[in-house]
Amino acid sequence: MAIAALSNFTVPLASDQSSATQGLLMPKLQYRFRISFEGLGGSKGQNTVELTKQVTEAARPTLEYEDQTIDIYNSRIHYAGKYKWSPITIKLRDDVNGYVSKLIGLQNQRQFDFYEQSSAASAGEYKFTMRVEMLDGGNGAHSPNVLETWECLGCYIQKTTYGSLAYKNNEVVTIELSIVFDNAVQTGTTAGLGIQGTDQTRGGTKTTGG
């Protein structure tokens, strides 16, 4: 009886909208995530797994459409203009072996040669891919399941903050990155954005994504 009562821990719904025995679905948790990088630092870059280990804070993508307005008699009509992805902030611990600092330095050097004062011929020479994965909490002998994956494509580091220092503080030294990217898609079984599918519109069935 006590176990059955757990199904009541949710919003009341009609029986034709939700199963009477289904309670609240388990939400994803903020601390169960993994950030990985592909191509950051270029051919001279070390193993980017060290970056993944040292991430302390991150974020998922933020998508925004530019609101456009058509003024008409006595009113206005709104429609979605071009979209934009907001930069993602990644905070990492700065390890004593210098792996994190070196990789970030190599990536910034790819974007602009600070010694020769020379820039890359094209953006494709320095852009990389970043993945934001939500995990289910598994570890060790129980491999984690990936609940959601965001692939951020065409990334570059817009801003690098090497962090403050203070004699009175015991906290670890961090490096904060602001990463700009061209596009983002969701992958995996729970993906909804950027995948191939069909959608019913007033004009009929259309294929999306792919």
Predicted regions span which residues?
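Glycine-rich, low-complexity intrinsically disordered segments
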Residues: 1-210
